Amino acid sequence: MYSIVKEIIVDPYKRLKWGFIPVKRQVEDLPDDLNSTEIVTISNSIQSHETAENFITTTSEKDQLHFETSSYSEHKDNVNVTRSYEYRDEADRPWWRFFDEQEYRINEKERSHNKWYSWFKQGTSFKEKKLLIKLDVLLAFYSCIAYWVKYLDTVNINNAYVSGMKEDLGFQGNDLVHTQVMYTVGNIIFQLPFLIYLNKLPLNYVLPSLDLCWSLLTVGAAYVNSVPHLKAIRFFIGAFEAPSYLAYQYLFGSFYKHDEMVRRSAFYYLGQYIGILSAGGIQSAVYSSLNGVNGLEGWRWNFIIDAIVSVVVGLIGFYSLPGDPYNCYSIFLTDDEIRLARKRLKENQTGKSDFETKVFDIKLWKTIFSDWKIYILTLWNIFCWNDSNVSSGAYLLWLKSLKRYSIPKLNQLSMITPGLGMVYLMLTGIIADKLHSRWFAIIFTQVFNIIGNSILAAWDVAEGAKWFAFMLQCFGWAMAPVLYSWQNDICRRDAQTRAITLVTMNIMAQSSTAWISVLVWKTEEAPRYLKGFTFTACSAFCLSIWTFVVLYFYKRDERNNAKKNGIVLYNSKHGVEKPTSKDVETLSVSDEK
């Protein structure tokens, strides 16, 4: 019992400066850690002229795959590292292997360690499980709570609109959509600095500080007396929330491996649905119990309560967010756990964040803009940001148009779709991670998304069909954790490239919603929204098709790096014989140089 108290209370307190400020942890890699990456160790072993013993460990007659393990000993440092290679003959490779997303990413032996019913990969050590559990609490769980309050502050305007704000402030015509756009514009503009600084700043300081700032602005929204004042407040709320979405996605890519990331990102997205769900419940409770208290309408109290919750969560963030493995500020991770997190990055071939290199490197930018990633992924994300009708508030506006529900009942009914969305989200995350098929997870969600929006575009259907269609609306967003996690994996080899691509694709995609929403989601057309539902269905279809383009380029990159993933390729049909272990060793040394 004492050891537990010491690890979660006593030791963390000792790591605080002046008893309340988390500071950067100074943790040096041990010699064993520095030599634990397989290729470096193999290279050193060969250069030391140590002997190598090669032997067959696994043979799959079905696929004619061979595994060989080379064991190298370096007596100087007492390091013994084993690396397994799969020797794969690509002669007569069937066409359907194109759909095997992990064909060149992980070898068959590693695949055998993945069990769909287990949260951890088979063979994960106790220390690594402990680290992952800590990260799940400190990063994944906290990010969920942070996204929850962020979304409370984002969508509360829709609940306020149907709870009396429209009449109190004199909303007319398209004022609602214009107010929503002001938030988006502020959010986009203030993402631009993070194009350069996302991987250069201690995010454990930045994110909570911005949380506190937008909390104060949310209080201000409770006291506005005109639509222009509300628009100004929403602009600055969007500005202070600008980096949060990007930053959490970046942090997931800094700690988790490719087949762990989607579930954690999906857990983060749960905060979005909890925010939508609880916004209706909170507004319903507030309107019923606080409407008129101290002369304030119920919708104004809603903003105040949202702000109070945001302040509390922001303060917790200073102590919960861990930074990243090479710039770690966590008071809860031990030195050995920080080293283990770094080792996991090396195993996943993830480039480390570096606060010390120069901010603007023209060579790096040329490399980024001459590569496929920034263009293909940006267009992909534009389809993603426009493939849902949730943010339009169409469901709530349709319910209100029926003129049969009281305001508290409207807010209660608004909780149904995000509740279902949470189920869709976790199901999609499990499909992507545990079945090792992110493309299938995306297609799975978009089939239902297209069906729902097509029904709503038709509109002249039975009321039950409309209920069914609106119940499917959260399938549109369910694939977003998959997309962002996949982007992290695609760009994993260089941290700055990963950050720049992430910010660029997000800015461009979110920018598209700022003007598209004005064109297709005009408030005066509610709740019919013919253009909106039609455009959303088309975006979902384009997203599905473009996912296969991403899959093609992703697999091409992974094939070029197959050996680093433990897969040695050859084609006997073209007269290329199976390489020997010595050939692979020589190539490993060559690659390292």
Curated annotation (Swiss-Prot):
Ranges facing Extracellular side: 152-175, 222-234, 287-302, 385-411, 460-466, 521-532
Coiled coil: none
Record membrane topology: Multi-pass membrane protein
GO cellular component assignments: cell periphery; membrane
One GO process term, biological-process aspect: transmembrane transport
Positions on the Cytoplasmic side per record topology: 1-130, 197-200, 256-265, 324-363, 433-438, 488-499, 554-593
CDD domains the UniProt entry points to: MFS_FEN2_like
Keyword Transmembrane helix: yes
Chief location bin: membrane
Pfam family, one: MFS_1
Domain of life: Eukaryota
Transmembrane stretches, start-end: 131-151, 176-196, 201-221, 235-255, 266-286, 303-323, 364-384, 412-432, 439-459, 467-487, 500-520, 533-553
Gene Ontology MF: a single term: allantoate transmembrane transporter activity
Keyword Kinase: no
Entry function: Not known; suppressor of sulfoxide ethionine resistance.
Protein family: Belongs to the major facilitator superfamily. Allantoate permease family.
Name the UniProt record assigns to this protein: Probable transporter SEO1
Originating species: Saccharomyces cerevisiae (strain ATCC 204508 / S288c) (Baker's yeast)
Lineage summary: Eukaryota, Fungi, Dikarya, Ascomycota, Saccharomycotina
